[in-house]
Amino acid sequence: LFAYKNSILQAHQRNDIISKVTLLTSTFQYILQIGALWLFKSYYLYILVQLLTQAITNVLTAIIASKIYPDFVPSGKLDVKEVHMINQRIKDLFTSKVGAVIVNSADSIVISAFLGLTVLAVYQNYYFILTSVIGIVEVVFTACTAGIGNSLIVEDQKKNFADLKKFTCIISVIAGSCSSCLLNMYQPFIKVWLGENMMLDYAAVICFCVYYYVYEINRILNTYKDAGGIWHKDRFRPLVTALANLMMNLLLVRFWGVYGVILSTVLSMLLVGMPWIIKNIFSTLFARDESKQYVVLLLKYAGVSLLGCVLTFFLCSYISIDGFGGLATRLFVCMVVVPVLFYLFFRKTEEFIASTKLIIQVLKTIQRHGR
C-alpha cells in the first residue's frame, strides 16, 4: 500500500524523512502493542497492530513524498517489454530477500529443535545485541545505496572501483572496531543486564564476533549488488547460500551445539555467498582482473581487525572495573585502538587517504548544518 513512494525519497537520499515517519509510527505501534498484551492479552491484536502501523507508515510517507516532489505523478502506460523487465527484476529481488530470511531464521529453528528453548532464549539475548549493532551500521549502507547506484551510471569503471575500495576501507574500520567492542563487552554487558546464569561460553562470543565481521563485509558486496541492480545474475546465490547454511546447521549442531550453528552461517557466507557475489559483481560492474586485488585488500583489513581484537582483548584483561564504568572503559579502548592500527598500517594508501578526506568533509558538513 503506497510503499512505492518510498523509492522517490530514497532516490533523492532523503532517508531522514522516512526515519522520522518510522520513528513516529513505531512509537505509536509499541504503545498499542503494549496495550494489546497488557489489557487484552491477545497476540492476534499484537500482530494486527504491526500490520496497521506499516500501512499508516506507507500512507504518511506517500503523502509527504507527493508534497515534496509533486512532479512525480504516475501516468500513461509502460511498454510491454519494460513491464516484463520490471516483473523479472521483482522476481529476482524476491529470491534474494527469501534467501536472507531463510538464513536468519534457520539458526533459531535448528537451535530450538535440537538444543531446546532454554538454550534458544540465551542465544537470542546475544543475537539481539548483535542485530542492534548491525542496525546502527545499516544506516551507513542505506544512506549510500542511492549515491552508489547513481555513480555506477554516471562515472567510469576506474572511479567506481576506487569508490568501492574507499567504502570498503571505511566499513572495515567500523566493523573491526565493533567486533573488538563485542569481543570485550559482550560478557560484561550480559552479566550486568541478565546475570551470569544467562551467559554463554566465551567461545560463543568469538563465534558471534566472526559472524558480525563477515556479515558487514558481505553487506558491502550486497550494497553494490543492489545499487547496480544485478539481481537477475545473482538470483540463485541467496537460495543456494541459505540451503548450504541449513545443511551445515543440521550437521554441525550435532557436534558443536550453538557454536556449530553460528559457524555454519559464517561458513556458508565465506565459502558460498561471498565468492559467488564477488564473481558476479566483478564480471558485471568492474573489471574481472580487479577481483584479486580486492580480495587481497579484504584479507589485509581482516588481518588488521584481528590484530586489533587480540590487542584490545589483552588490554581489556587488565580492566578490573565492574558495571557500567568498566563497560565505558572497554568501549573507549576498543574505539581507539582499532582505528589507530588501521592508520598505522594503511595511512599511505590511496583508499585510506580518500576515506579520511571524505569523513572530514562529512563532519564539516554536519557541523555547518548544525550551526
Model-derived regions: residue spans:
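Interhelical loop/hinge segments that connect adjacent transmembrane helices in multipass membrane
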Residues: Y43-I47, V59-S105, I109, G147-A162, ...
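Alpha-helical transmembrane segments of polytopic membrane transporters and translocases
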Residues: A55-I56, D92, D107-I109, A121-E138, ...
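Membrane-proximal transmembrane or re-entrant/amphipathic helices at the cytosolic face
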Residues: F286, F313-R371
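Helix-loop junctions and terminal segments of transmembrane helices
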Residues: A11, Y69-P70, L130-T168, N222-A227
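Interfacial/gating helices of multi-pass transporter permease domains
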Residues: Y43-L48, K81-R89, I111-T131, A162, ...
